[in-house]
């Protein structure tokens, strides 16, 4: 299993600088999605950091049946293709069903397996057979060493281009906690590891018909993960989180991304010995 993974011009793993996966939880509309992507491109160019754009075309696991889910597969992939054409950023989005894999693989650089679905064998095998990079999010119900089974399922297809993402562990009701040892444990599985700091501060179902969150802790948990030596950070971002159609309570305000990322890059450089003497 390669400990370094290159996705377009973004490198995860080895002793490379921490990369960023960022974007809105869900595509609200085309203009909104493109505007966020352009701002993230500016951050990439100004800081010289690797950036992958993320956005969901369908949030199939929303708390409430009436919650906004997104534009759907066809329209969503069209928007994401436009993002790539206009910004050059590599793209990741989550897939929820085997039937989505073929179409998604035509547009996406990374196929993401949602945490709730990380044990779904058919989905993991289909994603692996696509030949695309597969980002498996660790289920909130799994120990980090149990991710070896998910890795083995994808690798059995001959595809060893795998990322693993930590996003917190269930802690009682409506809460998550992050065990930073998980990052080191999963790294031993031979795959680059990403830390999803925004979902880690989510309060699942904590608002009754939606999830709550504590976005004020995103930077603190990101600092801890970078200090451990994580290969990538995953942030859901939004220009106005309080008005976001999904996961606003745990999204990082878009205007804070550059400042917060600069701080993470400084810590990362020290941890990985990449500072200039």
UniProtKB/Swiss-Prot annotation:
Its protein name is: 2-dehydro-3-deoxyphosphooctonate aldolase
UniProt keyword Transferase present: yes
Check the record and name the PANTHER family matching this protein: PHOSPHO-2-DEHYDRO-3-DEOXYHEPTONATE ALDOLASE
- Taxonomic source organism: Syntrophotalea carbinolica (strain DSM 2380 / NBRC 103641 / GraBd1)
Q: Domain of life of the organism in this record?
A: Bacteria
Keywords carried by this UniProt record: Cytoplasm, Lipopolysaccharide biosynthesis, Transferase
Which compartments does it reside in? Cytoplasm
List its EC numbers.
2.5.1.55
Question: Which Gene Ontology MF annotations are present?
Answer: 3-deoxy-8-phosphooctulonate synthase activity
Q: Which GO terms describe its biological process?
A: keto-3-deoxy-D-manno-octulosonic acid biosynthetic process
Entry keyword Cytoplasm:
yes
Q: Using the UniProt record, give the first listed, main subcellular location.
A: cytoplasm
Q: What class of enzyme is it?
A: transferase
Q: Which InterPro entries match?
A: Aldolase_TIM, DAHP1/KDSA, KDO8P_synthase
Chemical reaction(s) catalysed: D-arabinose 5-phosphate + phosphoenolpyruvate + H2O = 3-deoxy-alpha-D-manno-2-octulosonate-8-phosphate + phosphate
Which GO cellular component term is one of those annotated? cytoplasm
